[in-house]
Amino acid sequence: MKNVGETGPGKCQLLRCPAAGCKAFYRKEGKLQDHMAGHSEQKPWKCGIKDCDKVFARKRQILKHVKRHLALKKLSCPTAGCKMTFSTKKSLSRHKLYKHGEAVPLKCFVPGCKRSFRKKRALRRHLSVHSNEPLSVCDVPGCSWKSSSVAKLVAHQKRHRGYRCSYEGCQTVSPTWTALQTHVKKHPLELQCAACKKPFKKASALRRHKATHAKKPLQLPCPRQDCDKTFSSVFNLTHHVRKLHLCLQTHRCPHSGCTRSFAMRESLLRHLVVHDPERKKLKLKFVRGPSKFLGRGTRCRTPVVEEDLSHLFSRKLLFHFKTRLETNLSGLFNERQLREPAEPEVNLSGLFQRPQGRAKAEKSA
């Protein structure tokens, strides 16, 4: 452990990390010891939350990770106008010190330099100017990699050590993170949903899947009178109406000899993979609605079936709607009181059943 200088009014000693190539320094010895644990390949701290198999080298890392599971954010900043919340008193104190208070300055210990900084990161970046050397240098023999970021050094050193497979009994070490993920997919599936028995390779994917069981699925019924099918998305409902009820399969395959046609453009893109096996399946990007303009914390309104499919129904006037759709127009008859209450379903049902030729004849008459 090496003392690198004095700072601040109290002249606190700065302790530098003794690891080769690392120039991190701290005020307290406990924080330095915690930092040095990050240089070791051992990760003794394991998350005890169910379906989470993450391990950590430092105690504070696992404490922070567990609090993310529990979503503990109960400590609010007392400063007026500040809405920040924190899960630990230490985080709140650091926020008040650097954001709203007067932090103890870190003075540059190089003779003749009077610069001072509020954060150690800024001081480390400043020290590289005096020495004309990068803060982080790879200590592996034969490697001349340099950088001004300690985080980049840690990521670079993992390339030398490799990424070890976390499965029990597997000694595979991959040179890159991407290669490790490709290797992990070869292992048999071990995680399984207790509700539907669906297998997963990642704990994060299993947690996201479990959230779908808790949510109430969206039920969009088909508006055709003699169809009782329901769908969970507007896209599936639109595809159903275009293909089965309206027979609007306008997207044809451009390959010669192929007579396939589709109701949706996305279905055609998936079909094109059949003609070109080497072509990877496209990740389709669906344009979201105007929810981003509603601001944070607001929910987007559930899309109304009649609004999304109105342009489809206008193509065929003989499309019979369910009586549920006409009831939405009952407000038109509430402006004045009638002696005999009219039924909106009876008065409006003829609009959707009138043939096009008859409508033109009545208009000309």
UniProtKB/Swiss-Prot annotation:
SMART domains: ZnF_C2H2
Domain of life from the UniProt record: Eukaryota
Pfam families associated with the record: TFIIIA_zf-C2H2, zf-C2H2
Protein's name in the database: P43 5S RNA-binding protein
Annotated zinc fingers (C2H2-type), start-end: 15-39, 45-69, 75-100, 106-130, 136-160, 163-187, 191-213, 220-245, 251-275
Molecular function via GO: RNA binding; zinc ion binding
PROSITE patterns named in the record: ZINC_FINGER_C2H2_1, ZINC_FINGER_C2H2_2
InterPro entries registered for this protein in UniProt: TFIIIA_Zfn-C2H2, Zinc_finger_trans_reg, Znf_C2H2_sf, Znf_C2H2_type
Function: p43 is a 5S RNA binding protein which is a major constituent of oocytes and comprises part of a 42S ribonucleoprotein storage particle.
Keywords: Metal-binding, Repeat, RNA-binding, Zinc, Zinc-finger
Subunit structure: The 42S RNP particle comprises four subunits each of which contains one molecule of 5S RNA, three molecules of tRNA, two molecules of p50 (EF1-alpha) and one molecule of the 5S RNA binding protein 43.
One Gene Ontology cellular component annotation held by this UniProt entry: nucleus
